[in-house]
Amino acid sequence: AGEQLPGVINVSARALASHALSIFGDHSDVMACRQTGCAMLCESSVQEVMDLTPVAHLAAIKGKVPFINFFDGFRTSHEIQKIETWDYEDLKDMADMEAIQAFRDHALNPNHPCQRGSAQNPDIFFQAREACNPFYDALPAVVQEYMDKVNEKIGTDYKLFNYYGAEDAEHIIIAMGSVNDTIEETIDYLTAAGKKVGVVKVRLYRPFCAQAL
């Protein structure tokens, strides 16, 4: 992240061992990565993993920020589900070839040498660290741009945050991961009974774009 190199780590999120070992899914492992500088994109279902993983890859290249693309361990990672798969030509159509070429040109090459891995004093180090903030500020728009391209191709409605429920909800859950499918079914039941409830499904967790809520 510090060198603004794109990359995607796909993570089936699981619990960190504490008083006992647990290999089931919570988000304690990926939560430990919040301050690494990686963007974090979360999916709620197997179909969403298929649809949004390309968004992580394409946004990483164009936005120059690495991604942790995560989904719930076992509940999503090992679920057997019928899904619609992508054609590689469709993915190719969405790729920003200029951004890909710029990434390739950034590789170490004796024809255009560059300096990396320097040691800096505090007066320079903090300025250089702050200089990367515009890339993080711009990243939510890049992610939404690719979500829009996915939506256009397959008829979905992916956003940084998706709302589901009553328009005049009095109680709202904010959730991330496979629990959203269960929450949606519960909301259908409760709204049918006259309850005013809803859920905000978080997809882009880092950088968190409050303006998109």
Regions found by a protein language model. Give the residues of each.
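A glycine-rich helix N-cap at a beta->alpha junction
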Residues: E3-A13, L91-A99
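Short acidic, glycine/serine/threonine-rich loops at helix termini
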Residues: S18-F24, D51-P54, H78-T85, E185
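Conserved thiamine diphosphate
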Residues: L21-G73, M97
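Short coil/turn connectors at secondary-structure junctions
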Residues: G2-V8, H27-S28, Q35-C38, K62-P66, ...
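Short, solvent-exposed amphipathic alpha-helical segments in soluble enzyme
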Residues: G2, P54-A59, E84-D87, E185-G194
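Thiamine diphosphate
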Residues: S18-A20, C33, Q144-L213
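Acidic, glycine-rich active-site loops and adjacent beta-strand->loop/helix elements
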Residues: A1, V11-S18, V46-Q47, G73-R75, ...
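Conformationally flexible catalytic loops at phosphate/diphosphate-handling active centers
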Residues: F67-N162
